[in-house]
């Protein structure tokens, strides 16, 4: 009997393959980073072919490290950076343009055009999302409008669209030789095109965007057998049986299956998801309404989400662009060497402000600078920015739900940073809890795939795998917490109203 499940985690900065055992423990991993392409200010792209090649390679790495073969693997699960759009030729398998990444802001003029007459909430009742550069829909329209011949080829039925889950699945299951063109409900809910109530593509919205329905993948549940692997000999005939967008996957991996449970993932961006059960809840406080998960024919679970565009990528910017640090862990050392931020606040609105503001006219700002400030203060302010943004999202969740969260489960790469987690607890005023397995995104995809093939029997079995690793209790006085929040909110206002006709 196969004793393991493999998860493919196609993320913003890298592609990984992680093998899990029945207890949810990591057996082995493979990881490769891909190039971040910045052709112009506000533009962010990935090479989709590089992503697929890396995916094949990391599968081999993970299997060889554990000395396993395809016969040991019960199923493949896939999780992915959501909203990142790939358009490719179904006959050649070649992308017609680079993947346009979720952080990319080039489509603001398309957003403005579509908002005429109905505002940015024109489609929100159906899809749960405001018009924004963040989601896939405007990216597809941009490719059709700007790549020579793309619109004509799409109209002829020659082009396919997918977020990177669809791109990886299509290639994994055969590509041009019968690859399965599908997506799951969680990824579909991030396109601007799926009706949350019917879980189907909305033709009226597609017509408004000018996107042919023939390009779109078939919408499936998050946990069912979609097909089997054909293009990788290493996993040949292994069922591909689970797909979840990365933030929904992390929620699933945290075993937040029930109404009122939540998690916050600290990665390139920061994403808090609050499970609303089988009810579609429309936020009045700047949150997104999205699909949480759907297991086979079981009822759909929905969620509220607070999306923060920049978290770990702010640390990358300090390292790779400014050269202020040599490695990400160095930030914790620098931040710990000073008692406070020296009066400095960094608002990392590189792609505008996401939740709860949704201000596309905002841009990054560093405020409160004096000659006293050194790079240690900057490092501390960079970490604190993530915690402050999370506090604002949590306030919105509490306002929408009417039941304040009493603790916050966390995961993602940044949760290894003890200083950040302590400050997060301090600024939230509630305990912050890290699980033993922090690779919850990949684990969630593995769980979805394993459930579909009977590797795990039910959600109760998955819940028993979850275990607490560390807990941070708030230690900040309430008066100081309130003062810090007032200063943060003041700093946020300084980032707004920047983009106008003079800014290119």
Curated annotation (Swiss-Prot):
Binding-site positions, glycerol: 82-83, 134, 246-247
Regions annotated as coiled coil: none
InterPro entries assigned to the protein according to its UniProt record, in alphabetical order: ATPase_NBD, Carb_kinase_FGGY, Carb_kinase_FGGY_CS, FGGY_C, FGGY_N, Glycerol_kin
Binding site for ADP: 12, 16, 268, 312, 413, 417
Listed pathway(s): Polyol metabolism; glycerol degradation via glycerol kinase pathway; sn-glycerol 3-phosphate from glycerol: step 1/1
Regulation: Inhibited by fructose 1,6-bisphosphate (FBP).
Transmembrane segments: none
Known role: Key enzyme in the regulation of glycerol uptake and metabolism. Catalyzes the phosphorylation of glycerol to yield sn-glycerol 3-phosphate.
PANTHER family associated with the record: GLYCEROL KINASE, SUGAR KINASE
Protein name as annotated: Glycerol kinase
Species name: Renibacterium salmoninarum (strain ATCC 33209 / DSM 20767 / JCM 11484 / NBRC 15589 / NCIMB 2235)
Species classification: Bacteria, Bacillati, Actinomycetota, Actinomycetes, Micrococcales
């Amino acid at each position: 009997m196969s004793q393991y499940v493999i998860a493919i985690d196609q993320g913003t900065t890298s592609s990984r393959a992680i093998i899990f055992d029945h207890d949810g423990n990591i057996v082995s991993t493979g990881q490769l980073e891909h190039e971040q392409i910045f052709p112009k200010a506000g533009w962010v792209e990935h090479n989709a072919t590089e992503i697929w090649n890396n995916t094949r390679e990391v599968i081999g790495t993970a299997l060889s490290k554990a000395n396993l073969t395809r016969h040991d693997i019960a199923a493949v699960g896939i999780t992915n950076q959501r909203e990142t759009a790939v358009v490719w030729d179904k006959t050649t398998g070649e992308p017609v343009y680079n993947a346009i990444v979720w952080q990319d802001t080039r489509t603001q003029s398309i957003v403005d055009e579509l908002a005429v007459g109905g505002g940015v909430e024109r489609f929100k009742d159906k899809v749960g999302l405001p018009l924004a550069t963040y989601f896939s829909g405007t990216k597809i329209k941009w490719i059709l409008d700007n790549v020579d011949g793309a619109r004509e080829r799409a109209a002829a039925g020659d082009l396919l669209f997918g977020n990177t889950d669809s791109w990886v699945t299509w290639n994994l299951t055969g590509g041009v030789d019968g690859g399965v063109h599908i997506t799951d409900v969680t990824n579909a809910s991030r396109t601007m095109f799926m009706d949350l109530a019917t879980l189907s593509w909305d033709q009226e919205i597609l017509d408004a965007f000018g996107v042919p329905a023939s390009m779109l993948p078939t919408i499936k549940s998050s946990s069912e057998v979609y097909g089997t692997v054909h293009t990788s000999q290493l996993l040949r005939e292994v069922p591909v049986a689970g797909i979840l967008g990365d933030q929904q996957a992390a929620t699933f991996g945290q075993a937040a299956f029930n109404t009122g449970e939540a998690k916050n993932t600290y990665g390139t961006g920061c994403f808090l998801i609050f499970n609303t059960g089988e009810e579609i809840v429309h936020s009045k406080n700047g949150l997104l309404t999205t699909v949480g998960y759907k297991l086979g024919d079981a009822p759909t679970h929905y969620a509220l989400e607070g999306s923060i565009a920049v978290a770990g990528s702010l640390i990358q910017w300090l390292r790779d662009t400014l050269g202020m640090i040599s490695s990400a862990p160095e930030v914790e050392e620098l931040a710990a060497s000073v008692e406070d931020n020296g009066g400095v606040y960094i608002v990392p609105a590189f792609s505008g402000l996401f939740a709860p503001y949704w201000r596309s006219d905002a841009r990054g700002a560093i405020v409160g600078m004096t000659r006293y400030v050194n790079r240690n203060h900057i490092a501390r302010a960079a970490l604190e920015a993530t915690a402050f943004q999370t506090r604002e999202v949590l306030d919105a969740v509490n306002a929408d739900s009417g039941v304040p969260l009493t603790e916050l489960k966390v995961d993602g790469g940044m949760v290894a940073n003890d200083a950040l987690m302590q400050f997060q607890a301090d600024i939230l005023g509630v305990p912050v809890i890290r699980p033993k397995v922090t690779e919850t995104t990949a684990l969630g995809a593995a769980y979805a795939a394993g459930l579909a093939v009977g590797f795990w029997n039910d959600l109760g079995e998955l819940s028993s795998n979850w275990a607490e690793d560390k807990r941070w209790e708030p230690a900040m006085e309430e008066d100081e917490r309130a003062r810090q929040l007032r200063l943060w909110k003041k700093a946020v206002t300084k980032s707004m109203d920047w983009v106008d006709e003079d800014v290119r």
